Swiss-Prot record:
<keyword id="KW-0547">Nucleotide-binding</keyword>
<dbReference type="GO" id="GO:0005524">
    <property type="term" value="F:ATP binding"/>
</dbReference>
<dbReference type="GO" id="GO:0034605">
    <property type="term" value="P:cellular response to heat"/>
</dbReference>
<dbReference type="Pfam" id="PF17871">
    <property type="entry name" value="AAA_lid_9"/>
</dbReference>
<dbReference type="InterPro" id="IPR036628">
    <property type="entry name" value="Clp_N_dom_sf"/>
</dbReference>
<dbReference type="InterPro" id="IPR001943">
    <property type="entry name" value="UVR_dom"/>
</dbReference>
<feature type="region of interest" description="Repeat 1">
    <location>
        <begin position="5"/>
        <end position="70"/>
    </location>
</feature>
<feature type="binding site">
    <location>
        <begin position="216"/>
        <end position="223"/>
    </location>
    <ligand>
        <name>ATP</name>
    </ligand>
</feature>
<feature type="domain" description="Clp R">
    <location>
        <begin position="2"/>
        <end position="144"/>
    </location>
</feature>
<comment type="similarity">
    <text>Belongs to the ClpA/ClpB family. ClpC subfamily.</text>
</comment>
<dbReference type="GO" id="GO:0016887">
    <property type="term" value="F:ATP hydrolysis activity"/>
</dbReference>
<dbReference type="InterPro" id="IPR027417">
    <property type="entry name" value="P-loop_NTPase"/>
</dbReference>
<feature type="region of interest" description="Disordered">
    <location>
        <begin position="823"/>
        <end position="848"/>
    </location>
</feature>
<dbReference type="Pfam" id="PF07724">
    <property type="entry name" value="AAA_2"/>
</dbReference>
<keyword id="KW-0143">Chaperone</keyword>
<dbReference type="Pfam" id="PF10431">
    <property type="entry name" value="ClpB_D2-small"/>
</dbReference>
<dbReference type="InterPro" id="IPR050130">
    <property type="entry name" value="ClpA_ClpB"/>
</dbReference>
Length: 848
């Protein structure tokens, strides 16, 4: 039974126990419950007794006259008397008779009156209160109406505990009055939804089926339209048919919660409908309208939608619903009888310009909440960046969230103590530790000095904290576009500088940045840079991918490496590259692995290898390696990606590709690379060879791929073969990676020009490109160097120079060996040799 007690009813029981202790009584009787009811002071029972002139002091005096005080204060638990238990049982009956699912202070008072024979009833009679009159007073306060019929209608909820008459106790319990909230300025302003609000007013003014349902994507502002209607009602900006209406939002969760027995939910809903029908001025708003279908429908019961249908059809109940497009189709459209009773009102996603106006209208609320100043540039950045980079949500919700989190972030930063205060704390703690150590060592002079230092540090810290609190905290922090970009960077993983650095400066030096990793391939780097610049300059369809390229040419010339460099330039991380080996998708049925298996097939729940990666990292470079090895059906699926920037996976979800760069690599047309004519280290005819190879590659691509596929590609880039100078520069690049690993061991690696030339000669293969160079460096440099490190022939603190013996740089150099010389680095410490001190340890210079 006690689980049905309201918080105030539980407090009455606690106060009754306290009153019994004050009177030294070892029991809790009806008189103590009466004292607890009056002592509580805020419930319906206390208000009723107060209106009859019954005070706590008067009741306490009467109880002492009738019973007197006990001899000794009780200890431990104080039990209820049988009569007090009966009162609590009667309070449950009173609640059930009134149709309430809880026990409040009013029900306990009604139980006292109904019992009628205890000390509490005697006290009330002695104080001149007629028990019948007290009962009527409680019923009137509960219902807000006069007479028996009104009392029956006013079957209140916990609203009865408010202590003031109310005519909407059921609605107050299971809903919220939006017009009252609008009158108290608790609702955010609604900007630019005049058409939707006007359409809702038109539907509400119909004679029958006057029930609009707001349909739109999550976050576009469906609830805001209803709040705008509530504000219009308060301001009188509605037609005569809607004036003086009260707009309530119904919480279906509260209706269902606590309905333990069959019929409880239906009974609550019927009471809500009865109260709405009795008042006649209520418009009901049901958010997440689809929850009506099946709500409360236990075995043998009917759901909320079936209860509402008759009243909705006859116009007896005016209801505004709100739900998303998917849920409307899934739940409402399946129930044709329910669907025809609602009139759809589409709520579309606002434009970026409209979103900026919405943010300006909300600026005052967020500035007051976070105690910051939000600039116009921050609102423009929030709308534009959210629209560009957050693809799985909708405006204005995602832009508002950016503003909100940026304000919260700035406020938290200002409330965090500066680093120098923490440094003071560390110094003070250190001084105290040293002082205690000095005291333990009985070095009292040092302890006194440390005590003075501690006092000085404490005073300095107090002064710095005073400056911080009077300065930084009083200054209004400003949220600008940079703060918005930082928050967006935390959301999406895009490095902040990629958003805030001037795009023009970055794009103009794009070739320079790419060439830090790509040797040669001027045409390829320029073509990629130009395509990206066109995209970022806004001269490309924003719905298409940022760029789509076919990288063709011989193997080992840098096609994949350029893709990685492009990913690092655009998104700040090599991991932003999604690399897919198309050789794994050579059969028709393997295409499902790429985009997701259809329902009923193995792997349906796992999603596709491509679509899932892009959904998780929508800002990335996608590399389709060796595209010619894939099945033809995959090309057909990629047509939609190349044209519209989107793809539907096996689970029906739309994956957005508009922020990706698509790169297809191919070796078509390069089968003649093994022929000796015009290949290898080219001399004068290199350009003619390249044009001949480029023409053949293009011809082969046209034979292998359909025209509609090639027509959607931004650019086809044929890579050059590598020249001797480019191979030597590539040696520098690869050796620098080995040198960086040696730096960790405090060793420096240097190569002579002859050593580089020999590595280039041995590492380049006209068929395999530059990939064998990596193996050559591993075999000739890394393997030998690792042995010398293990034999301690070279070690930390040395400069290792790699050279070759007996080779003039012109011959084949097949028998020439590399030499490794370790020389100790020049010391940066004082020269001890002049003082006659020679350092020992470490290997002597070794030449092999």
């Amino acid at each position: 039974m006690f689980e049905r007690f309201t918080d105030r009813a539980r407090r009455v029981v606690v106060l009754a126990q306290e009153e019994a202790r004050m009177l030294n009584h070892n029991y809790i009787g009806t008189e103590h419950i009466l004292l607890g009811l009056i002592h509580e002071g805020e419930g319906v029972a206390a208000k009723s007794l107060d209106s009859l002139g019954i005070s706590l002091e008067a009741v306490r005096s009467q109880v002492e006259d009738i019973i007197g005080q006990g001899q000794q204060a009780p200890s431990g638990h104080i039990p209820f008397t049988p009569r007090a238990k009966k009162v609590l049982e009667l309070s449950l009956r009173e609640a059930l008779q009134l149709g309430h699912n809880y026990i409040g202070t009013e029900h306990i008072l009604l139980g006292l009156i109904r019992e009628g024979e205890g000390v509490a009833a005697q006290v009330l009679v002695k104080l001149g209160a007629e028990l019948t009159r007290v009962r009527q007073q409680v019923i009137q306060l509960l219902s807000g109406y006069q007479g028996k019929e009104a009392a029956e209608a006013g079957t209140g909820g916990r609203g009865g505990e408010s202590g003031s008459p109310s005519t909407s106790l059921v609605l107050d319990q299971f809903g919220r009055n939006l017009t009252a909230a609008a009158m108290e300025s608790k609702l955010d302003p609604v900007i630019g939804r005049e058409k939707e609000i006007e359409r809702v007013m038109q539907v509400l003014s119909r004679r029958t089926k006057n029930n609009p349902v707001l349909i739109g994507e999550p976050g576009v502002g469906k609830t805001a339209v209803v709040e705008g209607l509530a504000q219009a009602i308060v301001h009188g900006e509605v037609p005569e048919t809607l004036k003086d209406k009260q707009l309530y939002t119904l919480d279906l969760g509260s209706l269902v919660a606590g309905s333990r027995y069959r019929g409880d939910f239906e009974e609550r809903l019927k009471k809500v409908l009865k109260e709405i029908n009795t008042r006649g001025d209520i418009i009901l708003f049901i958010d997440e309208l689809h929850t009506l279908v099946g709500a409360g429908a236990a075995e043998g019961a009917i759901d909320a939608a079936s209860i509402l249908k008759p009243k909705l059809a006859r116009g007896e109940l005016q209801t505004i619903g709100a739900t998303t497009l998917d849920e409307y189709r899934k739940y409402i459209e399946k129930d044709a009888a329910l669907e025809r009773r609602f009139q759809p009102v589409q709520v579309g996603e606002p434009t970026v310009e409209h979103t900026i106006e919405i943010l300006k209208g909300l600026r005052d609320r967020y500035e007051a909440h976070h105690r910051v100043s939000i600039t116009d540039s921050a609102m423009v950045a929030a709308a534009t960046l959210a629209d560009r980079y957050i693809n799985d949500r909708f405006l204005p919700d995602k832009a508002i969230d950016l503003i909100d989190e940026a304000g919260a972030r700035m406020r938290i930063r200002r409330m965090t103590a500066p680093p120098d205060l923490r440094e003071f704390d560390e110094k003070i703690a250190e001084a105290r530790r040293e002082k205690e150590s000095a005291i333990d060592a009985q070095d009292f002079e040092k302890a006194a000095s440390l005590r003075d230092r501690e006092k000085q540090l404490v005073a300095q810290r107090a002064e710095r904290e005073k400056q911080w609190r009077s300065g930084d905290l009083d200054v209004i922090a400003e949220v600008d576009d940079e703060q918005i970009a930082e928050v967006l960077g935390n959301w999406t993983g895009i490095p902040v500088f990629k958003l805030t650095e001037a795009e023009t400066t970055r794009l103009l030096r794009m070739e320079e940045e790419l060439h830090k990793r790509i040797i040669g391939q001027e045409d390829a780097v320029k073509a990629v840079s130009k395509a990206i610049r066109r995209t970022r300059a806004g001269l490309k369809d924003p719905k298409r991918p940022s760029g789509s390229f076919i990288f063709a040419g011989p193997s080992g010339v840098g096609k994949t490496e350029l893709s990685k460099a492009l990913a690092n330039f655009l998104f700040g991380d090599d991991d932003a590259l999604i690399q897919i080996d198309m050789g794994e998708f050579h059969d028709r049925f393997t295409a499902s692995r790429l985009f997701g298996a259809p329902p009923g097939y193995v792997g349906y729940e796992e999603g596709g290898q491509l679509t899932e990666k892009v959904r998780r990292k929508p800002f990335s470079v996608v590399l389709f390696d060796e595209i010619e090895k894939a099945h033809q059906e995959i090309y057909n699926s990629l047509l939609q990606v190349l044209e519209d920037g989107r793809l539907t996976d096996g689970q029906g979800r739309t994956v957005d590709f508009k922020n990706t760069v698509l790169i297809f690599t191919s070796n078509l047309g390069t089968s003649d690379i093994s022929k000796p004519v015009g290949l290898g280290f080219t001399q004068g005819s290199g350009e003619n060879d390249y044009e001949r190879m480029k023409q053949k590659v293009n011809d082969e691509l046209k034979k292998h791929f359909r025209p509609e596929f090639l027509n959607r590609i931004d650019d086809i880039i044929v890579f050059h073969q590598l020249s001797r100078d480019e191979i030597i520069r590539m040696v520098d690049l690869m050796i620098s990676r080995v040198a960086n690993q040696l730096k960790v061991k405090d060793m420096t690696l240097e190569l002579t020009n002859k050593a580089k030339a020999l590595l280039a000669k041995r590492g380049f293969d006209p068929v395999l490109g530059a990939r064998p160079l990596r193996r050559t460096i591993q075999r000739e440099i890394e393997d030998q160097l690792s042995e010398k490190i293990l034999f301690e022939e070279v070690g930390p603190g040395q400069v290792v120079t790699v050279d070759v013996d007996n080779w003039d740089g012109e011959g084949p150099g097949e028998d020439v060996k590399f030499t490794f010389t370790g020389i100790r680095k020049p010391s940066t410490e004082p020269d001890l040799a002049k003082a006659g001190v020679h350092s020992a340890g470490g290997p002597e210079p070794v030449e092999q």
